[in-house]
Amino acid sequence: MASAGSGMEEVRVSVLTPLKLVGLVCIFLALCLDLGAVLSPAWVTADHQYYLSLWESCRKPANLDIWHCESTLGSDWQIATLALLLGGAAIILIAFLVGLISICVGSRRRFYRPVAVMLFAAVVLQVCSLVLYPIKFIETVSLKIYHEFNWGYGLAWGATIFSFGGAILYCLNPKNYEDYY
């Protein structure tokens, strides 16, 4: 503390820790992976005869070269999966914007907890959608050929994992780690 007569002022500096920066990168990667998962045409594929995305289901009879596609938005479980996944992605987007704004504005520390809570909420929504999807798919769609959950489904899991990682990084208290920076 400086005396009033010396002309020195007390300046508070908020240091951006690498943990929070890596957390923000995790959130950004989660957003990119969510976008790829939602737009992916391949959540389930089966021997070049069937594919299922969040938006449409297509079949190709073995003896024809024409695909027959229909919207998946007529099925309650597929609408629920899409709503949960998009809800989680929206929360991740809000958390990313809050995290980005907190870096640009000097008061970062007060935004850490809300970002972490939003990310944990998004993880819960996305895990629910990713568990619901294969259970209801196997229950309702009877394929007599080999099928596999494809890269669109994997991207959604990747987004969920990166969101969880970002949430953990935003939970860490930088005061406990000042010696390392």
From Swiss-Prot:
Subunit structure, as described in the record: Interacts with CTNNB1, CTNNA1, PRKCI, PARD6B. Interacts with FYB1.
Coiled-coil segments: none
Transmembrane region(s): 21-41, 83-103, 115-135, 152-172
Functional description taken from the UniProt entry: Regulates cell junction organization in epithelial cells. May play a role in the transition from adherens junction to tight junction assembly. May regulate F-actin polymerization required for tight junctional localization dynamics and affect the junctional localization of PARD6B. During podocyte differentiation may negatively regulate activity of FYN and subsequently the abundance of nephrin.
Modified residues (N-acetylalanine): 2
Major site of localization recorded for this protein: membrane
Gene Ontology, cellular component aspect: adherens junction; cell-cell junction; plasma membrane
Record Gene3D superfamilies: 1.20.140.150
Top-level taxon in the UniProt lineage: Eukaryota
Sorted UniProt keywords: Acetylation, Cell junction, Membrane, Transmembrane, Transmembrane helix
Protein name: Transmembrane protein 47
Higher taxonomy: Eukaryota, Metazoa, Chordata, Craniata, Vertebrata
Family: Belongs to the TMEM47 family.
Tissue: Expressed in podocytes (at protein level).
Localization of this protein: Membrane; Cell junction; Cell junction, Adherens junction
Membrane association type: Multi-pass membrane protein
